[in-house]
Amino acid sequence: MAEKRNIFLVGPMGAGKSTIGRQLAQQLNMDFIDSDAVIEERTGADISWIFDLEGEDGFRKREERIINELTQMQGIVLSTGGGAVLSKENRNYLSARGIVIYLETTVEKQFQRTQRDKKRPLLQDAENPRQVLEDLAKIRNPLYEEIADITLPTDEQNAKIMVNQIVDLIDNMNGLNGAL
């Protein structure tokens, strides 16, 4: 059997990276890793607290080290934080070490999905969260597109359908009947 390639999920907060990633990993019999969860586990603090204490720059440095480490593993489905693509190094690690799937969503759908989530540091204290999401999209969406091998809109699909689409697309990319 061919060596399994890593699958890296990128996209904005609320796109469904963690939900889809878990199901995708299960279907492909791969390990699922969420880079934000690894950062929280290693620091013993949640992302919001790290942002408060170290600022976004401090968090991004931690994130870069973790993504460098995780992308060197084999046979994983990795869900990245929405801002991981801001680092050129992260974009290089992701695009060189696996298949990058951009889970695309609209600002409106993001707003609906993140409205009650208190673990989104960039939205927590925002007077106008929708505007923050629009501003982030302007900066980040071109970076997601830059490194994506596959782009999939997530607004109208449920996770199971998305997972099946991803598996089919990867199979077609590889030309291997189901082997990653």
Swiss-Prot record:
Record's keyword terms, sorted? Amino-acid biosynthesis, Aromatic amino acid biosynthesis, ATP-binding, Cytoplasm, Kinase, Magnesium, Metal-binding, Nucleotide-binding, Transferase
* Source organism: Haemophilus influenzae (strain ATCC 51907 / DSM 11121 / KW20 / Rd)
How is the quaternary structure described? Monomer.
Q: What is this protein called?
A: Shikimate kinase
Record GO biological process: amino acid biosynthetic process; aromatic amino acid family biosynthetic process; chorismate biosynthetic process
Gene Ontology molecular function terms on file: ATP binding; magnesium ion binding; shikimate kinase activity
Q: List its EC numbers.
A: 2.7.1.71
The similarity comment for this entry is: Belongs to the shikimate kinase family.
* Pathway of action: Metabolic intermediate biosynthesis; chorismate biosynthesis; chorismate from D-erythrose 4-phosphate and phosphoenolpyruvate: step 5/7
Q: Which reaction does it catalyse?
A: shikimate + ATP = 3-phosphoshikimate + ADP + H(+)
What main location does UniProt list? cytoplasm
Q: Which amino acids does the record list as binding Mg(2+)?
A: S18
User: What does the cofactor section's free text say about binding?
Assistant: Binds 1 Mg(2+) ion per subunit.
Q: What is the lineage of its organism?
A: Bacteria, Pseudomonadati, Pseudomonadota, Gammaproteobacteria, Pasteurellales
Residues bound to substrate are D36, R60, G82, R140
GO cellular-component term (any): cytosol
